[in-house]
């Protein structure tokens, strides 16, 4: 039996999900299956599919108008957990559900670009696309291209009766709770909301019967409780429960033979600038890239990394992860901002800033260089990171002040309009597209919270989404990174480690090496006990 130490709401999300149930959440790799899956290096292989579409073949056609058609062939004799056949019609039905606006997935990738999904026969799935989409051959392998099937034999009538009403189809249907039926390596036996999920191995799993017979997922909302359970041997696997310093403590308490810590250096950190002129502080950080570059040179990222990551993070000058294919090219072409107070001084002076006799900087408008730096409440590490950066900038003569933002009591609008600099998870270059700027029109949703806009980056991001040639994808990644590192909508800090812990005699969990590695439990069917 495996017992997971996970946040309290995980158990509820595992089955109820955020909009369409387990299909779009972390447990997809435990309770459901997809067309394709990625390994720890981001390499894609068939899952429910017997084969994946190949570019420039009959299975992946690109038409002159930019639309596409992909064809997946399913493995024969697939079944759901209840023994009923899983066919291409289940994907057709899933698409009909996901594109219903009330369910909240109709504008998400890849659903937003699917114009039709058809099943010429029980094993063939033909998808028409409104535009090019690079991941059209690997649906289900990543969170950004999820398209899991739904059991038509269980849900079609309920979906029809609901008339497309999410209020009727989702919370009122037992399928989304204790009645969940999927096609993943484990099938649901019992569900105690917010407390636990019990599951057993699925004999007919597409990749072979799991080697461990039973899995128990426990809800935990306290890190100390989770650590005690792991040390005592009551829990055998903890997914992303611990911060770096807590991982060190757990490693020490375990001793040399007590358990295994997987340090996954994929969590990225940034300092993002506010670009809305009426909210920028000071204004010059929104209007002059030289000022932003000066701040970047004034920050000692290595010192912040060393203090926060407990020695298990990863530094990179370009923001590109060293395990990405385009890393060597990015290292050659993308701007770097090493800690260099002299260069920071030069850039500030070029931008019209003046340093007073007291060592403090004044803006070109002869106002004090007051700079609020925000962090999210609830994390000691984020607070520690913030304190380090604030102290560094103060020593350089900037009137930096620590500010805390509480996501529980504040709105998306308030977060989007924060002045100064906001610490957070680093955005990939394509996520600075102007369509991701939070506005009143989109209810203040979107990851480009600082409101950065660059037409050339938008153009490259649009091309990136539609690129299918591997060489073109590499080139676009580097070109987007070059713009972001030059114009500097954010300061990339470092990669910190997510901590995954498991018992010493549990074999099979693997570190993810790139962002495109899929879920941490993607290979749970291969895990086994070493007696």
Predicted features by range, described:
Residues 1-4, 372-374:
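Short, well-ordered beta-strand segments
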Residues 108-164, 307:
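Surface-exposed binding/hinge segments that line
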Residues 2-63, 179-183:
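N-terminal lobe/hinge region of extracytoplasmic solute-binding protein
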């Amino acid at each position: 039996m495996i017992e997971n130490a996970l946040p309290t709401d995980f158990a509820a999300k595992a089955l109820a999900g955020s909009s369409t149930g387990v299909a779009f959440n972390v447990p997809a790799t435990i309770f459901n299956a997809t067309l394709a899956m990625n390994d720890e290096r981001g390499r894609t292989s068939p899952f429910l599919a017997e084969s994946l579409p190949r570019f420039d073949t009959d299975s992946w056609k690109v038409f002159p108008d930019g639309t596409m058609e992909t064809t997946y062939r399913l493995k024969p004799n697939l079944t759901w957990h209840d023994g009923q056949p899983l066919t291409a019609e289940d994907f057709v039905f899933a698409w009909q559900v996901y594109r219903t606006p009330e369910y909240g997935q109709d504008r998400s990738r890849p659903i937003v670009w699917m114009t039709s999904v058809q099943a010429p026969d029980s094993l063939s799935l033909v998808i028409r696309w409104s535009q090019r989409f690079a991941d059209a051959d690997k649906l289900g392998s990543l969170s950004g291209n999820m398209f899991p099937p739904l059991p038509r034999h269980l849900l079609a009538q309920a979906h029809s009766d609901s008339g497309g009403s999410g209020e009727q189809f989702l919370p009122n249907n037992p399928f989304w709770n204790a009645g969940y039926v999927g096609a993943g390596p484990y099938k649901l036996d019992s569900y105690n909301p917010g407390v636990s999920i019990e599951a057993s191995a699925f004999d007919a799993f597409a990749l072979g019967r799991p080697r461990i017979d039973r899995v128990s997922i426990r809800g935990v909302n306290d890190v100390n409780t989770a650590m005690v359970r792991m040390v005592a041997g009551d829990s055998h696997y903890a997914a992303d429960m611990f911060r770096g310093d807590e991982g060190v403590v757990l490693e020490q308490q375990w001793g040399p033979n007590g358990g295994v810590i997987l340090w996954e250096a994929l969590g990225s950190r940034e300092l993002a600038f506010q670009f809305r002129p009426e909210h920028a502080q000071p204004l010059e950080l929104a209007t002059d890239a030289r000022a932003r570059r000066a701040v970047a040179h004034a920050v000692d990222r290595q010192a912040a990394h060393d203090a926060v990551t407990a020695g298990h993070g990863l530094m990179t000058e370009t923001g590109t992860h060293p395990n990405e294919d385009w890393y060597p090219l990015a290292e050659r072409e993308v701007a770097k901002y090493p800690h260099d107070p002299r260069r920071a001084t030069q850039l500030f002076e070029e931008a019209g800033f003046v340093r007073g006799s007291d060592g403090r900087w004044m803006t070109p408008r002869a106002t004090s260089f007051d700079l609020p730096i925000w962090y999210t409440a609830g994390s000691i590490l984020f607070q520690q990171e913030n304190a380090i950066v604030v102290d560094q900038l103060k020593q350089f003569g900037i009137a930096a002040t620590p500010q805390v933002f509480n996501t529980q009591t504040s709105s998306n609008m308030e977060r989007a309009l924060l002045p100064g600099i906001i610490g957070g998870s680093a955005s990939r270059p394509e996520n600075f597209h102007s369509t991701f700027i939070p506005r009143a029109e989109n209810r203040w949703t979107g990851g480009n919270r600082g409101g950065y806009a660059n037409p050339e980056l938008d153009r490259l991001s649009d091309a990136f989404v539609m690129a299918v040639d591997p060489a073109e994808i590499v080139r676009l990644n580097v070109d987007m990174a070059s713009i972001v590192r030059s114009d500097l909508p954010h300061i990339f800090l470092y990669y910190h480690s997510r901590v995954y812990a498991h018992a010493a005699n549990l074999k099979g969990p693997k570190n993810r090496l790139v962002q495109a590695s899929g879920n941490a439990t993607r290979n749970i069917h291969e895990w086994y006990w070493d007696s």
